[in-house]
Amino acid sequence: MNNTPSHPDIPALVADLARARLEARPLPWPATVPADVPLAYATALAVRAARSEQGDAPVGYKVGFTNRTIWPRYGVYGPIWGTVWRSSLVQIDAAASNEGVISLKGLCEPRIEPEVVFGLREAPPPDCTAAQLVAAIAWVAHGYEIVHTHFPGWKFSAVQAVADGGLHGRLLVGHTVALPAATEPEALIDALAGLRLKLYADGVLKDQGLGANVLDGPVQALLHFVRELRATPGAPALRAGDLITTGTLTDAWPVQAGQRWHTEIAAAGPLAGALKGLAVRFE
């Protein structure tokens, strides 16, 4: 692990972020804060350390803005990443129906993002290939990340999104599909890139997406993240058991308490009939 960079602005930025999260209020930052990407990630890592010391625990990572089709809408033109927390994660038991309940309490302007989620059986080797990465994946699942922002109207810069926890709010992970270590890499890569998804709100079709929307496929998005994480000063190393989201297959849609959203999924290859649609109710 590299040493986390220090900067005189970090303590004040961390304090602002803590207040915004705990009080669900906007951040009082001008467009020039943080000053750059390294400072934004250093701030996010300082928040991670402080929140861990307070008793929460990181369980993995979210990768955002991998969907090139939405870059112009948000003014962010490249992927970012943030931490997923034990307190923000809901996993559906394999014995239960593939439907979960998420509380929106404490979130600011929440939106729903249907995603592909991976769980690691081991840390992939440094500078891994796609095949080595697939061998390190224990399971794949469909999930929803509920993103939110402390910048009113979803108006922020890329560096502000990074500092603001990568916009992570909640994560619902549906039934997992186990991947044997001998899974054929190209078959999985192609199946996920070709995945088709329909997103419904209270029974009404809202959007449609493709696996290929996220950097040409979820495995490709995961590979990009693995390399970016290693290149970030002070970032933690990946561990067995980490889960990683790979970005929304559709646009991010506003949600509110009382709604029920669900997806329909069409997948081929090793995921045919295994990766299923997911429902969520909001409170």
Each PLM stretch: what is its role?
Residues 221-256:
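A conserved acidic, glycine/proline-rich C-terminal tail/linker
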Residues 249-253, 267-272:
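Short, charged beta-turn/beta-strand-edge "cap" motif at the junction between a beta-strand
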Residues 257-268, 280-283:
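Short, compositionally biased
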